[in-house]
Swiss-Prot record:
Organism from which the protein derives: Bordetella pertussis (strain Tohama I / ATCC BAA-589 / NCTC 13251)
Family: Belongs to the SurE nucleotidase family.
Domain of life: Bacteria
Cofactor binding: number and manner: Binds 1 divalent metal cation per subunit.
Disulfide linkage: none
Protein name: 5'-nucleotidase SurE
Any Gene Ontology CC annotation: cytoplasm
Molecular function terms from GO: 3'-nucleotidase activity; 5'-nucleotidase activity; exopolyphosphatase activity; metal ion binding; nucleotide binding
Amino acid sequence: MRILVSNDDGYNAPGLEALVEALSGLGELTVVAPETNHSGASNSLTLNRPLTVRTAANGFIYVNGTPSDCVHVALTGLMDARPDLVVSGINNGANMGDDTLYSGTVAAASEGYLFGIPSIAFSLIEKGWQHIESAARAARQVVERQIAQPLAAPVLLNVNIPNRRYEDMKGYAVTRLGKRHPSEPVVRTTTPYGDTVYWVGPVGLAADATPGTDFHATAQGQVSVTPLRLDLTQHSQLDDVRNWAEPLCVNA
């Protein structure tokens, strides 16, 4: 079993170290992670400059690029053999609902998924690392289950873990994505040089946390497991759009 491990918080993040330690013994681990924090990088690839690859003292490989860069470089340039599984995390904070569109953690797993490799993203739902060992233990359980009984391809799982002791978790729930309210307004400030700059505001609160969602499950103390796909087509709207577009004419 060959497992590629990445994240978006950077190669020296506690969540990555905890995940690697938790997965030790399950197979041959290769760690390729960003040099610095790339939270919110989504699926971006670096196309305007070359990427450098270095190895840290602990053996982790780090790239001066995005999470997607890391997995892409690992799969197409660094690894001698194709991995059986790609895992990402453990993220410092939730990746639920709309977060998945922006998340570098989910993006690293998505890159593996695009290559046809089963991929799993792990996140601890609150900032800080108070119960990172518990989150790592839950992550190992999910990986062990995938190894023991692999899901039919394609596989892209988004796992969000409550920030509590492992003994206080209320099991696992398979969920759909919830939805957040829009982010808070940008924060405008002035630099010491008199320039006006803007910081993106905090994420919005949950707008859809009804039963069956990732928000609801984690609020109940459950580990949320959400199967994702990358097909963004609104299939239910195809017929409506065909009818709407019928009068359009290139030569009109």
